[in-house]
Amino acid sequence: MKTLILTGGGSAGHVVPNIALIPALREKFNLVYIGSDGIERDLMKGRGVPYHTVHCTKLVRGSVLKNIAMPFRFLKSVSEAKKALAAAGADIVFSKGGYVALPVVLAAKKLRTPVLTHESDLTPGLANKIIARRCRAVLTSFPDTAKLFANGIYTGAPIRTELLRGD
């Protein structure tokens, strides 16, 4: 069975869609989650998916001083992500964006691991704008968002099957 890496985080909006995909993906892939030590770690607990932590930092917009060490931390996070991908035996990466996804996607590209990303918002986030060119496809929740990317494909939003049943 191939190994699919799930990544994305910084907010629940980047993690919950990945959680919705787990039951279907688990049937065809070994799943591993790579994220930060933040909300995604808490949300993934008890889901039966191995978790690897990457110590990444969020860009603080408008503050040069708070970002001065960021390039060094970022390089370290790419290195950590590369090690986690190699240890997991990654065959493909599925990203939901957010600052956590950036080092994971860049590490995947260094390892020549294919990447898909999903943009849930009508207006693409910064991380997905940066990684879009490095992805096989940018999957989107909205048709108009797909048009913003050369490799955009409208797929709709991943949701839990319980919502379809009204549970």
Language model regions located:
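An amphipathic, basic-hydrophobic alpha-helix
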Residues: 63-92, 102, 110
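An aromatic- and histidine-rich active-site surface loop
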Residues: 38-42, 92-111
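Short amphipathic alpha-helix
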Residues: 14-25, 39
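Structural motif
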Residues: 7, 34, 95-96, 118-119
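Active-site-proximal region of nucleotide-activated glycan assembly enzymes
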Residues: 30, 50, 109-166
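Residue-level detector of alpha-helix initiation sites
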Residues: 11-12, 16, 98-100, 122, ...
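Conserved acidic residues
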Residues: 2, 89-91, 136
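Conserved nucleotide-sugar phosphate-binding/catalytic loop shared by glycosyltransferases and other
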Residues: 3-9, 29-73, 153
